Amino acid sequence: MRVILYTGKGGVGKTSVAAATAVRCAELGQRTLVISTDAAHSLGDALDREVGENPTEIGANLWAQEVNALRELESHWDRIHVYLSTLFSSQGVNDIVAEEMASPPGMEEVASLMQIRRHKEEGRFDTLIVDCAPTGETLQLLAFPDVARWYLQRLFPASRAVMRVARPVVQPFVSIPLPPDDIFGHVRKLLLDLESMKSILGDPRTCTVRLVLNLEKMVLKEAQRAFTYLSLYDYLTDLVVVNRVLPAEVQDGYFAAWRQIQQRYDASVESLFDPIPIRRSKLFDHEMLGVDRLSELADAVFGEDDPSTTFYRAVAQRVRKVNGQYELTLQLPFVSRDEVDVTHGDGEIYVTVGPYKREISLPRILTGRRVTRARLDEGALHLTFAGSAR
């Protein structure tokens, strides 16, 4: 199943472009589902149809779904949530605060993304288009499987068998409720679900991310940051869509100045996102509502091309041997040396860029070797490792 995630700053037309992509894929005969994981759903508005929390048939080969995040959260987290709430309350935490603390930030959104795993397993659809939340929330969402795994492994470090033996002995001497047996089953299932979802989203052969932007400074800056952080987490960006470009016939009065501003920023888009392909769509003189209008938008963005095509392919990480030393290369566009921090763990390295930190498991050949040099060159971070293990 082909998976395409659309994200961008709020208000750039991301939902319209995602819906237009789905419409065109359906027209090409692909069984296509477009889903919205944004808490403020507008997918139904774009399609000009009522869309439910389960796949709703819109037309030939086309379905739409607005995910109910709370319901998804309950199905994946409810039993663990009950235990954690009890745990925090037992330590004197206010009941309401305990309820909030029992759900790590971003859990609602990641539960929504579990729908991708479900649809992949069911095999009903050829193409899945995901209308994600605005950029910042999407970045947190895509990083969350790593965060959730860390959170769960530290909250529940013991195995079910160990806890079954230890509980009768330990419980009388501690003030916290120890997790019951069934909790470990729920945690294990959730960890497996997170790993499965990450493997789907992180497979560049089938899943890519697309950035939608307008020709404005703040929007471009946010798109650049998104591109950087997506690269940090190994998500492949295969297309940038520049939306709502003022057409050439707009030459007079109020919009003439706006057209000049857009032209100035448009001149830099190619170099900013090179080598990612750029597609453009004009600002239409009518609202893009309903399947027919969205098909018109798809014409503008994709022309005769199949939107499910992967328009750009790249290797996010590469290991090679140079002069007897191993070098690991990571793609990190738009960052300066001062913004990057690299620390070494046991079998992994931690790369921090701005507010985002990623744990990168090292291939076996690099395990036990120390980083001797780090350099940034043409949008890539090069880490040199010692020739022999410590």
Please tell me what each predicted stretch does.
Residues 338, 367-389:
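Beta-rich strand-turn-strand
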Residues 1-12, 16-195:
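Nucleotide-state-sensitive switch-loop elements of NTP-binding domains
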Residues 321, 344-345, 376:
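Generic beta-strand structural signal
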Residues 39, 134-135, 336, 347, ...:
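A generic "binding-loop/recognition-motif" signal
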Residues 109, 113-115, 330-334, 343-346, ...:
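Charge-patterned, long linear interaction tracts outside catalytic cores
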Residues 339-347, 364-365:
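Extended Gly/Ser/Thr-rich low-complexity repeat segments
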Residues 5-7, 34, 63-66, 129, ...:
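Structured core elements
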